Every structure is written in structure tokens, then in C-alpha cells.
Amino acid sequence: MFQRWSFALCRPIVAAAQVSQQQVPPSEEPRNESGAANPPLVKEEFLRQFRERLANDKTGRNSLEGFLDLPENLPPTAASIGPLKRGKEPLPPWLKLKVPMGASRQPRFNKIRRNMREKRLATVCEEAKCPNIGECWGGGDEEGDGTATATIMVMGAHCTRGCRFCSVMTSRTPPPLDPEEPRKTADAVADMGVEYIVMTMVDRDDLADGGAAHVVRCVTAVKERNPGLLLEALVGDFHGDLKLVEMVAGSPLNVYAHNIECVERITPNVRDRRASYRQSLKVLEHVNNFTKGAMLTKSSIMLGLGEKEEEVRQTLRDLRTAGVSAVTLGQYLQPSRTRLKVSRYAHPKEFEMWEKEALDMGFLYCASGPMVRSSYRAGEYYIKNILKQRETVEAPSVSDGGNEPKDSE
């Protein structure tokens, strides 16, 4: 916009300057005492007329507001640098994060990152450029009361499915599994020094068991090397084969997680055709039945994909009916141009509402917020929930003990 009106403004001035240049032959140009030519009169005339025209401009475009093509109701001080892409809205304030703290203030974060580089271990935290990496890896370094958490992705970096929200690379024939991966993962986790690890996986529909046996070997190796570690396995649906689900659920993990991702209506447009809403519910329900409620089950929902309020509420009900104990809700953000676009940015107040409703439905805990992801600060929430459960169990015994008669001396 600035170019259009500025060119229109300057065109008559340039024309006048060209006329002035023609009226002053080169031989008659004013010269100083040394014989050198003075600055061209054309430049002086141009600047004089340009300043005069700007000073007399009454269009209102000769201002900061006129110079910047701002979105409606956006003050100039909040303008983005550079042009906005057509159809792309600026991020709301609650999705703009602060730069993570430096090395001197986050020793846990830097230790984990250093070990990742040395072991050449892939994490979803870095691969997906998760905005919460400082909080999870730092684990409350500043306050000293948090739990460092990391998310490791096993079975390679290529997935056989093509969900439209995910940025993980897709391949029909991914590389074969690394038989040394269980040992390497266990060694790396031991060096990382975390208290809680989330082990996720790519879908491997090219394998007969979907990689279930490999996941069990990884879980077992990590727990044997790190017996005090809390381990959450965020796994796929294994083609809906419940025997494979039982195989993983029977391994020494602490939390069985499987994400339902979104509400039922939009699932065919969001997830790969081999995944389904009802199949995910069936997997989660079977884990709860197989372990007789002893296994903590967990799932996650994304907002901003075109869902309606009542649909989110129904999804929470379905998860709770399936016996899911923990749920997370977060804002979907488009990872690349080829992925689904964001339909809306849910306000933080809405996430607070869903957290309250989830807890009222009977979930043991709920992490709900714009930047929350399925493994967001998983260790901290898990530990707090365990402590809360212990306090609830111990409270009656203390009360009962207080009512017991004392032995006579």
C-alpha cells in the first residue's frame, strides 16, 4: 500500500526535477572555487518539493497507521514485522512464549540435551519443536520441586501412517528395527538422570505385530537399568489386535497412554484411515479390563480442528466410560504448510472449563491448557497425583488410630 501512494506522490516531483535538469546545461552548472561541480540542483529540487508535498498532505496516509497495513483493531505497537500470509491470523498473546532460561539456571535441561547429542537419541521434544521443552527437561530447576521429563521415540523416525496433523515423516517401507535400540535407550535414559520418561513410538503397520514385541523389549531394558524410574508408554493401536495390546500392557510400565486425538466426527479427516475413534476407545477399555484397573491409562485431545463444545464433552465422557484415568487437552498448532490448518484458537478460559469438567467426571487428573501436549510435564502431574492418592488412603487410618483405646499401663 505504501508503495502505491508514495509512487503517485513522487511522480509529479520527479517530472518537475527532470524539467529542471533539462533547463541547466552541463556547461553552465554552478561550480565552487576549486572548479568541482556543486551538488546537482535536481536532488535539491526533488527533496524540496517532496518535503513540501508531504507537509501539505491531507489524506491521512502520511502516518504510521497509513504506512502499516494493520489488521483491524490491532495497535501499531503490536504490528508484525513483514507481511502476513493471506488467510493466516497472528497468534493470540497466550500462545507467545518467553525464551527459555540459560544454561546457568537450567542445569537439568542442559544435561539432558548434552546426553541426547552424545547418544544420538531422538526425542519427540526436539523433533516436534515442542514449546514446553524447557519446562519438561528443566523439571522445575528454578523452584527445585519439579520432575524432569523427556519423551523418546523408538522404532525409527518414519511412520507408516499419514495423520494430517502430525509432522513425523511417513514411509510405506521404513528401515528395519534396530535390535540394539533397547540397550541404547536404557543406557541413554540412565545418563539423562530424569525421574520420568515417556516412550512413544511410530506406527509400524509393515510389521506383523506392529512393533509390540520391540516396545516390550525397550520398556523392559529401561526398567531393568533404571528400577526407580517411572515409565509411560505412549503407543499406537496395534491394528486393534487386543492380544498385542495385552502384551504391551503386561510389560513393567507405569502408565499406558494412547491418544484419541480429536472428537469422533472429525476423526476421518484428521487421523489416518487405519485409525478410528472407536478402535482407540476399545484399546483403552481393554487395557483397563485386562489389568483390572491397576494400570493408569491416559489419553489426549486436541482443540482447534473444527470440534464443537458438546463433542468435546462427549469425548471426555467416552474416555471416562472406557476407564481412562488421566487426560490432557491442548491447542492444535499447524506444524507445516502441508498439515491441517488451525480452525480456531481456544481461549485459556475454555481450557480451564474443560479441566474442571474432566475432574468432575472422575478423572484422577487433567492437564488442560493452550500449550499442553500429551506428555506435558507428565512426571510432575503423575507424582502429584500419586501423593494425593496416598494422602487420601492414609487419612482414614490416622483417624481410626486416634479413636482406638490406649493400653492400660
From Swiss-Prot:
It comes from Trypanosoma brucei brucei (strain 927/4 GUTat10.1). This is Lipoyl synthase, mitochondrial. It is an enzyme of class 2 (transferase). Pathway: Protein modification; protein lipoylation via endogenous pathway; protein N(6)-(lipoyl)lysine from octanoyl-[acyl-carrier-protein]: step 2/2. [4Fe-4S] cluster 1 binds at residues 125, 130, 136, 375. Keywords: 4Fe-4S, Iron, Iron-sulfur, Metal-binding, Mitochondrion, S-adenosyl-L-methionine, Transferase. GO terms for cellular component: kinetoplast; mitochondrion. The lineage of its organism: Eukaryota, Discoba, Euglenozoa, Kinetoplastea, Metakinetoplastina. SUPFAM superfamilies: Radical SAM enzymes. Residues 21-41 are annotated as: Disordered.
